[in-house]
A protein has these predicted regions:
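Active-site donor-binding loop signature of nucleotide-sugar glycosyltransferases
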Residues: 3, 18-20, 115
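NAD(P)H-binding glycine-rich loop region in Rossmannoid oxidoreductase-like domains
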Residues: 13-62, 66-69, 84, 166
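Conserved Rossmann-fold NAD(P)-dependent oxidoreductase catalytic core, especially the SDR/UDP-sugar
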Residues: 49, 54-97, 104, 108-111
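Oxidoreductase cofactor-interface core, primarily capturing Rossmann-like NAD(P)-dependent enzymes
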Residues: 85-174, 179-182
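SDR active-site strand-loop-helix element
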Residues: 1, 38-39, 75-81, 113-115
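Short aromatic-enriched loop/helix-cap "lid" or pocket-rim segments at secondary-structure transitions
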Residues: 10-13, 27, 123-127
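Structured catalytic cores of enzymes that bind and process phosphorylated ligands/cofactors
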Residues: 8, 16, 32, 62-65, ...
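Short, polar loop motifs at secondary-structure junctions
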Residues: 1-8
Length: 182
């Protein structure tokens, strides 16, 4: 399920473009066994904290519940390093709330991706992220040892890992896990 067309998808991936502002109840979910949830926004683009929560938490949970009803057994979600449902930071708290809810839903396999700054093209301008993407290669070199998990990572690298992952159970993936996969 996507909000917009994704270029160069493998032939075994079915893409369903939907308007998340309309009712998801009207969407006919295709049969599948693995749901990848990569949806997210910013408070600025959502217009408010409530709008952000709607996209980053409510829509994601609704999609997961609908997918589970049609037999999906594996879910992969992109969250954020530092996600914690008790965080004082609103963004990290919402990300943590999503993880907590997904873990209670009973999927056979749950893959949780916890990246630092996501690198990639955006349809909209994000001033601070643009600056971050420019300085990330310099800062990344300073992040060694236990700090490596905070390195920036290309969104494409996470997507490729999601599609190839053969793990079972509950799994947490950080920068090194994704980049060192053979």
């Amino acid at each position: 399920l996507t909000r917009r067309k994704i270029k160069n998808l493998p032939n075994n991936i079915n893409e369903l473009i939907i308007d998340f502002n309309s009712s998801l109840k009207e969407v006919s979910f295709p049969e599948c066994d693995h749901l990848c949830v990569c949806m997210g926004t910013t408070i600025k683009n959502a217009g408010s904290r409530e709008g952000f929560k709607k996209v980053d938490l409510d829509y994601c949970i609704d999609i997961a519940q609908r997918a589970q009803k049609i037999g999906v057994s594996q879910i992969s979600i992109i969250s954020s390093i530092g996600a914690d449902d008790q965080s004082r930071n609103f963004y990290l708290r919402i990300k943590g709330m999503l993880i907590k809810k997904i873990l209670t839903m009973g999927f056979d396999t749950v893959n949780i991706y916890l990246p630092g700054l996501l690198i990639g093209k955006r349809n909209e301008k994000r001033f601070l992220e643009n600056i971050g993407q420019k300085i990330a290669p310099i800062i990344d070199r300073l992040l060694v040892g236990k700090m490596k998990k905070y390195r920036s990572i290309k969104a494409d690298s996470i997507a490729a890992h999601m599609i190839r992952s053969k793990t079972k159970g509950v799994n947490y993936f950080y920068y090194e896990d994704i980049m060192n996969e053979k």
